[in-house]
Amino acid sequence: MDWGTLHTVIGGVNKHSTSIGKVWITVIFIFRVMILVVAAQEVWGDEQEDFVCNTLQPGCKNVCYDHFFPVSHIRLWALQLIFVSTPALLVAMHVAYYRHETARKFIRGEKRNEFKDLEDIKRQKVRIEGSLWWTYTSSIFFRIIFEAAFMYVFYFLYNGYHLPWVLKCGIDPCPNLVDCFISRPTEKTVFTVFMISASVICMLLNVAELCYLLLKLCFRRSKRTQAQRNHPNHALKESKQNEMNELISDSGQNAITSFPS
């Protein structure tokens, strides 16, 4: 797996992210990717070789291991990181499309006053508004869904986040209920809790960023509405509307008073 490519893609999105989004990217690569690549692979590197059962029945050990660990912790975490990071591609593609359209308009002479050259367009920080706001918030929403889904799958597959010292297995072809042991269960439990905690932190950061974007949108719309109300044209329209209402009211009163009794 090429983690450098993943870092390049998400690092490009980091330029256009909010402050909370930049913290999320830092947590992803320092507390999850680095731990997974550097430490977790060393801890889980011997998981099947050192899985021992107190029986010599052929096939019993393999069947019990497959029953208790249907998917490797490392592979599941790697798959989770891929799914969680993939929505960032939506933002990257949207920004690339925006820059392409801006460069095309610049070549046709429509954006000459805003940019000096094409390199200036590439260096521009795209603001999260308009259609990009919807793309960005959608990517955050999908990240939250993926984080929650993988945490549930992890809990469902392994019956919790704690690795026991002894596993009881009575699946065929085991002759009876046998005891199986995994290597370094305490250390693996610590790493498991750490990775789950990092997932929870990332999910909370995503929720906080989503709330921040929603509040910012409401504030921007409120400010825009207030500016429109304070605009001279808006005041002139209100003045004309009030005059029309007064004329209609006066004409109605005159019609009532002139009506023969």
From Swiss-Prot:
Gene Ontology molecular-function annotations: actin filament binding; beta-tubulin binding; gap junction channel activity involved in cell communication by electrical coupling; microtubule binding
Subcellular location: Cell membrane; Cell junction, Gap junction
Function per UniProt: One gap junction consists of a cluster of closely packed pairs of transmembrane channels, the connexons, through which materials of low MW diffuse from one cell to a neighboring cell.
PANTHER family: CONNEXIN, GAP JUNCTION BETA-6 PROTEIN
Alphabetized InterPro entries for the sequence: Connexin, Connexin_CCC, Connexin_CS, Connexin_N, Connexin_N_sf
Topological category with respect to the lipid bilayer: Multi-pass membrane protein
Annotated protein name in UniProt: Gap junction beta-6 protein
Entry keyword Membrane: yes
Extracellular topological intervals: 46-75, 155-192
Segments crossing the lipid bilayer: 23-45, 76-98, 132-154, 193-215
One GO cellular component, as annotated: connexin complex
Cytoplasmic side: 1-22, 99-131, 216-261
Origin organism lineage: Eukaryota, Metazoa, Chordata, Craniata, Vertebrata
UniProt family annotation: Belongs to the connexin family. Beta-type (group I) subfamily.
Tissue specificity comment: Highly expressed in adult brain and skin. Less in uterus, lung and eye. Very low in testis and sciatic nerve. No expression before birth.
